[in-house]
Amino acid sequence: MAREFSLEKTRNIGIMAHIDAGKTTTTERILFYTGRIHKIGETHEGASQMDWMEQEQERGITITSAATTAQWKGYRVNIIDTPGHVDFTVEVERSLRVLDGAVAVLDAQSGVEPQTETVWRQATTYGVPRVVFVNKMDKIGADFLYSVGTLHERLAANAHPIQLPIGAEDTFEGIIDLIEMNALYYEDDLGNDPHIKEIPADLKDLADEYRGKLVEAVAELDEELMMKYLEGEEITKEELKAGIRKGTLNVEFYPVVCGTAFKNKGVQPMLDAVLDYLPAPTDVPAINGVLPDGEEAARHADDSEPFSSLAFKVMTDPYVGRLTFFRVYSGTLNSGSYVQNSTKGKRERVGRILQMHANHREEISIVYAGDIAAAVGLKDTTTGDTLCDEKEQIILESMEFPEPVIQVAIEPKSKADQDKMGQALAKLAEEDPTFRAETDQETGQTLISGMGELHLDILVDRMKREFRVEANVGDPQVSYRETFRKSAQVEGKFVRQSGGRGQYGHVWIEFGPNEEGKGFEFENAIVGGVVPREYIPAVQAGLEGALDNGVLAGYPLIDIKAKLYDGSYHDVDSNEMAFKVAASMALRNAAKKCDPVILEPMMAVEVVIPEEYLGDIMGNITSRRGRVDGMEARGNAQVVRAFVPLANMFGYATHLRSGTQGRGVYTMQFDHYEEVPKSIAEEIIKANGGNNKED
């Protein structure tokens, strides 16, 4: 099968935005106009083509980035729909990694919103060229020029309109094209056949002003155009388009278009802008990788180079099983052939290759450089792995994923759920690198951790729907520790002698605090054999075994020293078991003399917020028993660094989101253990029924 679309006529783009700016609706319209859908699905009716998980249709948000293929004016456009919720930033990161360009969708009433800032920063990190689509021009309060202003103020982006709206809110009827200098009016409801007319007289001055600004901005990026501009020569529309394309590809310029996807206006000109200004696979730099011998190498977008690709998403599909989405960077791949997973060192067979159209799929026999497709039949491949030619191996740069920040305990409701839960958690962890499931050695609970409360809610919900596993989700648990603050000499004596073979073990041990992080240290200071040498390891083992159960509330004892300096033994009745028990009794007796305390994990927290929220956020950190450790300005945001007890960080993501209208982001990781205030320690001991793990 010959290549249907040349590399130059291929576009891999993402649609990115704040939650509710209308990304999914925009993608829907693209699919409608490019002839892939015959009936338009509305998101708020829960019938959208891109949102194909039940939860997405219920909640009206996009969780998984579905990749879909469309055709427009002789070009192939592969579109990845990305989620706009903070908890799903990993989905955005992984889709940006395999895109060449993106359309940033703004809400005309709000302009740049918090999640837009986050996604925009991620796109800048990956050097992704962007076109901006100001959507919802029909909405009450829609203001195109205000929205363009927010691009400058909040993102410091060199963004300029290449269109202006004709009217706004319910009078929005078309757009002015600042390159062709004409007007497009939409007569019918589906926006299929816009009419080209003269620019209305009352908007002529505004159009001239913005055309002038556009020409000047483009000329600034290109010396030849600058010379023409300064000499007062006319810049042709071909030169203008070439200048915009060059600036956009270099991520120095962002063309802005407008419309309303919901009312079917302005979507086709936006698609034209995608073809005109966003890169083909041949316009982006070659991808770098490492060869088996450690040498660096590049792979270019070319069918004749060795096959190389990156798996960017794994999903379980109800019909075909496990689907691995991948982006081909070089070479070609036939279905039924073998490839090497060079990241894992495994050979994989590609059963079938599917080109995805939201939730319907088309089987193809070959994929070419620059394509995005899904493979069926890969067993060991996970997100971020490289798939390549067996003979010409290479490992491409992988993706980095953030560490999970929230953890909750989960338990199956019945025995039948127990077995299925393990499989379900393993499958979900395979699909999502920021989700972890593990068993807590101390409590025996299954703990799941992820990027936020919504993230975990949705995963538990998916267990129920897709894997039919019913589970109870507990409150998040904190792993406390215990230690000693004072030194003391303590006796431990275990004697049982009631006829026949008895038990006799007797030790004197000096306990005391050790340096933080040094753990448990045991010293043998016995002189003259008062405790025979063969029983010394038993004393140490007895202490180590008892440490796990603590002396106050059953939490492990850490950072203590124990020096065995005296004791006695019995020729017949002493044995290892007796000395083990004597040592653990000594440790328990130390609880009365060594001033034991409870320690809690302290998290290093970094909060990034717009300046106006600084006072509230600092106050909130203090109310959570946190200590502010430092502050700095980063761009137009403030960064607060603090240490906060983990026990007081639950629910923080939700608090921060509502307290800053979603504009604040935070990261936290474990830093050190610190003593719990007395009043809280008493509550913890009470909740655990004192040392509830005696004997």
Curated annotation (Swiss-Prot):
Annotated protein name in UniProt: Elongation factor G
Protein purpose: Catalyzes the GTP-dependent ribosomal translocation step during translation elongation. During this step, the ribosome changes from the pre-translocational (PRE) to the post-translocational (POST) state as the newly formed A-site-bound peptidyl-tRNA and P-site-bound deacylated tRNA move to the P and E sites, respectively. Catalyzes the coordinated movement of the two tRNA molecules, the mRNA and conformational changes in the ribosome.
Family per record: Belongs to the TRAFAC class translation factor GTPase superfamily. Classic translation factor GTPase family. EF-G/EF-2 subfamily.
Binding-site list for GTP: 17-24, 81-85, 135-138
Chief location category: cytoplasm
Keyword set includes Hydrolase: no
Organism lineage: Bacteria, Bacillati, Bacillota, Bacilli, Bacillales
Keyword entries, A-Z: Cytoplasm, Elongation factor, GTP-binding, Nucleotide-binding, Protein biosynthesis
GTP-binding is among the record's keywords: yes
Domain tr-type G: 8-282
Localization terms from the record: Cytoplasm
Family matches, as SUPFAM superfamilies: EF-G C-terminal domain-like (SSF54980), P-loop containing nucleoside triphosphate hydrolases (SSF52540), Ribosomal protein S5 domain 2-like (SSF54211), Translation proteins (SSF50447)
GO molecular function terms noted in the UniProt entry: GTP binding; GTPase activity; translation elongation factor activity
GO BP, one annotated term: ribosome disassembly
